[in-house]
Amino acid sequence: MMKYNNLFWAFSVLSLLGCSSSQEVKTIPDSLSGIYPKLAYYNNEGECGTGAVVPWADRLWVITYGPHLPEGSSDKLYEITPDLKQIVRPESLGGTPANRMIHKESGQLFIGPYAIDSLGNVRSIPYNIMPGRHTGNARHLTDPSDKIYYGTMEEGLYEVDVRTLAVREIYEDANFTKREKSSKEYGPIGAMLPGVHGKGLYSGQGVLVFTNNGEGSNEALSKFDIEAGVLAEWDGKDWKVVRRNQFVEVTGPGGIYGNTNPETDPVWATGWDYKSVILGVRDAKKGWTFFRLPKSSHSYDGAHGWNTEWPRIRNVGTEAHPDYLMTMHGMFWKFPADFTADSSAGIRPRSAYLKVIGDFTRWNDRLVFGCDDSALKGFLNARKAKANFPGPGQSNSNLWFTSLTKPDELGPATATGSVWDKDPVKAGEYSEPFLFSGWDYRMAWVKNDSSHSVSFAFEVDKKGNNQWTPLREIKVEAGESVHILFDKEELGEWIRVKTDAPTLATVSFTYTDSDERSTTSDEIFEGLAELDCNHSIGGLLYSLGNNRRALGIVSTQQKDGKVVECGYYEMNDTLKLVRKDDPESRDFIVEKCAIPSKVVTVESSSVLVVDDKGRRWRLPLGDEAYTGLMDQNALRICREVVTERDLFSCMGTFYELPAENADGYAKIRPVATHNYKINDYASYRGMMILTGVDPEEGKKNPHIIVSEDGKAAVWAGAIDDLWELGKPVGHGGPWNDTQVASN
């Protein structure tokens, strides 16, 4: 068990007279960084994600979901008016829905188990009639004017009459199928298809396409690099496995309406394996063709498939001027509306993000992202760096409103991916095409794990028209590796590689852009206490449960080198910090949310981190002042602030840290470096909350919220504001005057 240093709280018995008590009251805005606290939604389940977000009937319609609830739940259907009033619809049935489709012929939006007409009237299909975790809708193969398909995460398939809502079961949902379960399996596993955890459903070219992104084995709960998931299609009679990888989105240029010309329009599917993102496109004559893209974040990995939510490709332009936005592995992508196997040019990285996004849309000339922010149940995301830290008291999430250009304005588009990773390769065998255009700097790492030398020949498709030309060829000796730096003149939409001899090969690509960020934090962070501040207001944070829907804060102040407790405060959707007399909540936060000690070891060369498997990792050093603060347990180091991944704070740098089942520290991603004394951080109503504030410095900053008595203060914004803290910087290495043995 990790030891806790109680010195931080020993000063709570000191006189509260040491806390400041004067504060000029300022107006608190309705929203911060595009997040409206009043629009947050809660449920009584282990998770409260956003399943779908759709503009319809002059309203924005939103459904939420809890984890694995095929017969309904406390989740709701929300109707949001143009002036941002949230209406909880009485027809709500809950469940785990993420489906949405607009059926033009009947003038209805199908979202979750609901059908909504053009006037906003809602009809529900009860779960006892159509059970399962509704994951997708699709146009009917033979009667698209009168019927639609509903698909569930466990291979249930239903045909629904759009006018009467009569339901015909085609395939039973596996949650309700009696079958003997193996001790090596977890959860309900369908008998028709490999893989579990269904995600996408779409129809076109005479088939219904279904995806899932997980594997139903105990092995999948801890490993990220085993076979998992499926891309499959159904012709109305039989199922066919197209590819055995983890797939999520399946759609086409028709998007939420279905393809306009279903016989010929392409069908797109996104997925991944442990090597890279996979993009599939179906042609009516050629069938499926696959491409690969790099990953910006690895926090979506995991063979169980739980870490992804619902990645999407959606038109966020207009009907006259389509503009497709793709979310995949922590990156916003520009996706061409006319993408096919023979016209594949135009996919481009936009920027990296930290939010977990379940769906998104354009509404009233803004983008609206439905997020999965704070889950009561930590699922598999446990690690000793957090000790036994509790999840939020109640699951909650929110919408994130942004400008239309925000997907171009967040983190740098650094990305990595492989076409081969210690894979057996035959002589003359081509890799799948890998995206080659869209970054300032591109490199490849090539490894030959055979007993003989091998030549690797790279080719490019310059225009995305499936016409390939030689780029360069390199010879790699047995057991050796080579780095390749590509020049800016080496152009192409896609790159592929082949060898002249059989080998065990690795070919991995790393792409980066020039990071134009300053090392100075943006003005939205004014009022966070800098390292040399000796009068900052800190505090421990916890999102309360029992439907209180408030944030609890045990406020502290640093004064004359001592930490003094200033009282217990709460904040609700008005963003006012109010002092409360609630010793039970205060005691819970002090005991359960204390900052653990010895999470990392600061050495002369770098910061040593030992993960839960005993693997040793090193991170760069920052300002020396952080060493003392970390030793005093004055800085939170690790916490989950978006579902199923952690935010890691070390030596003044924030990192995105994947769950251990997604390879953890091996795939850590630096976000930003700052010069602030951030005491604690948490998610609440979709916002990122920080403590460690200098109220006087932040008195003009709307992101700094201070109680009327001046004894409690927080910074509030969005997690993706963190990119603006400053470019990641650091120094150090694995050794510093270290005695090293050979090998």
Can you name each region flagged by the protein language model?
Residues E45-A52, S92-S106, I129-S145, A174-Q205, ...:
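Repeated scaffold domains used in trafficking and secretory/extracellular systems
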Residues R59-V62, S106-F110, P144-Y149, S203-T211, ...:
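Entry beta-strands of beta-propeller and related beta-repeat scaffolds
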Residues G66-H68, Y114-A115, M153-E154, N212-G216, ...:
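Residue-level signature of beta-propeller blades and closely related beta-rich strand-turn architectures
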Residues G358-D421, N679-S742:
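Blade-level signature of beta-propeller repeat domains, shared across WD40, Kelch, NHL, RCC1
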Residues K488-A505:
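Noncatalytic modules at the cell exterior or secretory-pathway interfaces
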